[in-house]
Amino acid sequence: MKTFYLSIVCMVMSFSMTLMAQNPFRTEGDVIIDFNISPNGKMMVYKERTADGAMNIKIKELKTGKVSSLISMKLKWSDMKEIYSGVDFLTNNEIIYVKGENMVSFNLKNKKRRDLAQLPDILGYIKALDNGKGVYFTDAEQLYYLSIKEGSISEINKVDLGVFSMSIDKDNRLFYTIGKQVFCLDKAGNEVEEITSEIAKLVVNPYLIEATGSKNSFIVAGKEGIFKVDISKGQSIKLTDNEKENPVTKIRLTPNGKTLYYQRNLDYNKISTLEL
């Protein structure tokens, strides 16, 4: 009986050590272009570039740490749209990315790809609605919305300085940052409101934002660190420091709000984890 319990303890310790070893999680590629979390919080999709010019899209199961390769592309530097564009989940079973001149989706179950729309320019961020009905994306000058059903692209707003981050809350409002400014686009996609002053009261020089499950609560990266803020209560909690020489560049929160994944500027192929 003692041997049995000792075996169980060893298994638990081994599993815990495995999870610890995965924080930070290092990819096989040299540079992570983008990563996002599935709507059910079970998977991470990430896009990486290797030294030999290959572009890979992979899925990581967050519970087990298992990594599966989905798509591999050998690109030239002239393939700018594919190199610099992001990747996201359209649904739990479908991802979206850029292939050639088009926004495309890839079904994780049947492995089929479908073209969604032809793109206007070199893309940066891609952020899909959790209901799978639409996708927000940006280039260097413009914020767009793609309707999946209609296959049509609409111009939403000018973003002349380029978007640093995008996040969609449970009410399908889009939050995005341009430099040290924070904006909110209503769920109808019609009205843009700047909310920088509300955030800046709690975080110095905010430049990344991630929505949480609560309407007025966000994860925000600023000059002095990453914070969890509640603008309705005027409260902020510091989660971790922001290194001056190696600042945070990407933050992704799981849907249940319990785990934050983030990447720093010089951590080219490394994603760190913070339990909240």
Predicted segments — roles?
Residues 22-276:
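Sequence signature of WD/YWTD-type beta-propeller architectures
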Residues 1-24:
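Bacterial Sec-dependent N-terminal signal peptides
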